C-alpha cells in the first residue's frame, strides 16, 4: 500500500513531472500555496522517497545515439551470486539505461543505447558478454518510439 497523498501533494507531483525545472515560486502560484508551504511539501515528498530525483530528458538522436535495443538476458546458473555479479556489471555501463527482472523465459530485460549498430555489437561482445553468468542475449532493435514517459499517473492513485 502506498503513501496517502492529498490533492495538493498530487498537484505538486503532476506539475513537477511535467516540468521539473519550474521554480518554487511559479509552482506555488500554480497550485495556490504560499512559496514556503509549497517548498515544505516538496521537501516532504523528497524525504518520503516519493520524489526520487529531478532530472532532464535528453533527445538522444540529437546527440548521435541512433540505436535503442531491448536485450532479453538469461543467466546460468540463476542464483544469488550470478544475479549479484550481473547487476554489479550492468550498473557500471552507462549504455544500459534500464534493467527489469522478468518472469517467464528470460531473466532480465535491458534497455541499451548505442551510437550505431557496430557500437551496440561491440558493447555486447566486449562488455556485457564478459560476464560468464550470461548464457544468452536476445535483442530487439527499436525502430521508432511511439510513446515515452517517465511520469506516474498521479490521478490513478
From Swiss-Prot:
Domain of life of the organism encoding this protein: Bacteria
Entry's Gene Ontology BP terms: response to amino acid
Alphabetical keyword list: DNA-binding, Repressor, Transcription, Transcription regulation
Annotated CDD domains: HTH_ARSR (cd00090)
Pfam families assigned: AsnC_trans_reg, HTH_24
Gene Ontology MF annotations: sequence-specific DNA binding
Organism: Bacillus subtilis (strain 168)
GO cellular component: cytosol
Protein name (database record): Transcriptional regulator AzlB
HTH asnC-type domain: residues covered: 5-66
Summary of the function given for this chain in its UniProt record: Transcriptional repressor of the azlBCD operon involved in branched-chain amino acid transport.
DNA-binding region: 24-43
Record bears the keyword Transcription: yes
InterPro entries assigned: ArsR-like_HTH, AsnC-type_HTH_dom, Dimeric_a/b-barrel, Tscrpt_reg_AsnC-like, Tscrpt_reg_AsnC/Lrp_C, Tscrpt_reg_HTH_AsnC-type_CS, WH-like_DNA-bd_sf, WH_DNA-bd_sf
